[in-house]
Amino acid sequence: MGNGMTKVLPGLYLGNFIDAKDPDQLGRNKITHIISIHESPQPLLQDITYLRISVSDTPEVPIKKHFKECVHFIHSCRLNGGNCLVHCFAGISRSTTIVIAYVMTVTGLGWQEVLEAIKASRPIANPNPGFRQQLEEFGWANSQKLRRQLEERFGEIPFRDEEDLRALLPLCRRCRQGSATSAASATTASSAAEGTLQRLVPRSPRDSHQPLPLLARVKQTFFCLPRCLSRKGGK
């Protein structure tokens, strides 16, 4: 059931019920608060502050009604210098859904982008279809309404969470988020290179009016690879 709890943001961890009772992990990651979200959550350690929510991992369960309480709990913990672990039974669906809702609130990112970033370090993260639909319904408008409530209660959000989350995205995903100028330059260079390749690679008369799939693959590989390598080398 995974290889231990996963750090999503400074002060925010995602895991399963084994992680939540592992004193070595809890101590190493300095966990001070735990959200237990499964069928029968029970507090285990006296030195940790718990939020217990009884929720089954079934698509029809209205998990989004717990978003506000969980978001406030996590945010208060982080602002006070604590570390919060959000866990369910397997650390796959329920806990991931709660973490996504929090990250959406403090960053303004969409749930799919947040999930992609989480999967980069925790591939098993996978909300069930019903929870995904509820995250979609939560959306930008509701998450930003909740953000305003956080700021009214706690003040301006001091974290650089969006930057931290984007750093988790796969390199090629970040390549696609380049500036419009870079994209335009790449398009121009791509067209020129494709023309060169087409002149170098002979084609039969039958193919003279059809694009070559091989050339498309070569173009995609050679124009993404240098950018990814340069980003990776710059770390």
From Swiss-Prot:
Gene3D superfamilies: Protein tyrosine phosphatase superfamily (3.90.190.10). Residues 4-144 form the Tyrosine-protein phosphatase domain. May dephosphorylate MAPK13, ATF2, ERBB3, PDGFRB and SNX6. It comes from the Eukaryota. GO terms for cellular component: cytosol; plasma membrane. Its main location: membrane. One of its GO terms (biological process) is regulation of oligodendrocyte differentiation. This is Dual specificity protein phosphatase 15. Induction: Down-regulated by nerve injury. The gene is Dusp15. Keywords: Cell membrane, Hydrolase, Lipoprotein, Membrane, Myristate, Protein phosphatase. It is found in: Cell membrane. InterPro entries: Dual-sp_phosphatase_cat-dom (IPR000340), Prot-tyrosine_phosphatase-like (IPR029021), Tyr_Pase_AS (IPR016130), Tyr_Pase_dom (IPR000387), TYR_PHOSPHATASE_DUAL_dom (IPR020422). Isoform 1 is expressed in testis; predominantly in developing spermatocytes (at protein level). Isoform 2 is highly expressed in testis. Expressed in spinal cord and specifically in oligodendroglial cells. Expressed in embryonic brain cortex; down-regulated in mice with experimental autoimmune encephalomyelitis (EAE). It holds the Pfam family DSPc. The keyword Lipoprotein applies. GO terms for molecular function: protein serine/threonine phosphatase activity; protein tyrosine phosphatase activity; protein tyrosine/serine/threonine phosphatase activity. It catalyses: O-phospho-L-tyrosyl-[protein] + H2O = L-tyrosyl-[protein] + phosphate; O-phospho-L-seryl-[protein] + H2O = L-seryl-[protein] + phosphate; O-phospho-L-threonyl-[protein] + H2O = L-threonyl-[protein] + phosphate. Residues 183-193 have a biased composition (Low complexity).
